[in-house]
A protein has these predicted regions:
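Short S/T/G/P-rich N-terminal loop/turn motif that feeds into the first structured element of a domain
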Residues: 1-136, 141-160
Length: 160
């Protein structure tokens, strides 16, 4: 049905060395009747801050938050908070991964990607983590460091 149509998608290249950059650029910039790129950001660098996945499945659930550091914060202070978050998550049986993406170290804007292998993993994360005292503490700590403006959820597909 039309409700099941994919209207938006994201191409996220994890390993730039394994893909022909010229062909990728031709694909993204091509004029065609199938898709149009609304936003291009080829210079984002991803850093995995939290990984509690044994392996990432070929189909996964992804939440993308668009954020900005506060005036007294930067990647270093945010990394300390994310390390604390990771240590707290060890108390929970949660399958989860988080990536931090930004264009360069001087940029105040960044993306936070939450990865889950299944909707069950995602639901378990929210059910067991979100209402916990640890979660409230981390939410407050992250709120002191940054502000997020939007959050969107996607189904991700690994392409070989």
């Amino acid at each position: 049905s039309q409700d099941d149509e994919i209207k938006n998608f994201i191409i996220n290249v994890k390993n730039k060395e394994s893909i022909d950059q010229e062909n990728l650029s031709l694909f993204i910039n091509s004029e065609n009747n199938i898709f149009q790129c609304l936003q291009k950001n080829n210079n984002l660098v991803a850093t995995t801050l939290i990984s509690k996945l044994d392996q990432q499945d070929d189909i996964f659930y992804l939440e993308i938050l668009d954020c900005e550091f506060g005036p007294d914060s930067n990647f270093g202070t945010f990394k300390v908070a994310s390390d604390y978050f990771y240590n707290l998550l060890n108390e929970y049986s949660i399958s989860y991964k988080a990536d931090f993406l930004n264009s360069d170290s001087s940029s105040r804007n960044f993306y936070w990607h939450n990865f889950f292998n299944s909707s069950t993993d995602r639901d378990n994360f929210y059910a067991s983590w979100i209402d916990s005292e640890d979660s409230i503490e981390i939410k407050d700590l992250f709120s002191e460091q940054s502000e997020c403006f939007s959050s969107n959820s996607y189904i991700g597909y690994k392409v070989f």
